[in-house]
C-alpha cells in the first residue's frame, strides 16, 4: 500500500507519523510540544 512505499523517505516518514500520532493520541500535550519545539528550533 501507499504507506509502505513511502518508507523510502525516512525523514518524511517520521514527520508523517508525528503528524498522525500527536493530534490523535495527545492533542493538547502535542500542541504544547509543538510550540516548545517551534520555539527551540525556530522553524515556524
From Swiss-Prot:
Keywords linked to the UniProt accession: Amphibian defense peptide, Antibiotic, Antimicrobial, Cleavage on pair of basic residues, Disulfide bond, Secreted
Subcellular location: Secreted
GO CC, one annotated term: extracellular region
Keyword Membrane tagged: no
The keyword Disulfide bond appears for this protein: yes
Disulfide pairings: 38-44
Pfam families hit by this protein: Antimicrobial_1
InterPro entries per record: Antimicrobial_frog_1 (IPR012520)
GO biological process assignments: defense response to bacterium
Tissues showing expression: Expressed by the skin glands.
Pro-peptide positions on chain: 1-18
Role played: Antimicrobial peptide.
Family, per entry: Belongs to the frog skin active peptide (FSAP) family. Brevinin subfamily.
Name listed for the protein in its UniProt record: Brevinin-1PLa
Amino acid at each position: 500500500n501507499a504507506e509502505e512505499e513511502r518508507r523510502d523517505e525516512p525523514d518524511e516518514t517520521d514527520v508523517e507519523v508525528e503528524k498522525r500520532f500527536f493530534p490523535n493520541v495527545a492533542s493538547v500535550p502535542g500542541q504544547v510540544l509543538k510550540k516548545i519545539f517551534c520555539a527551540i528550533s525556530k522553524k515556524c
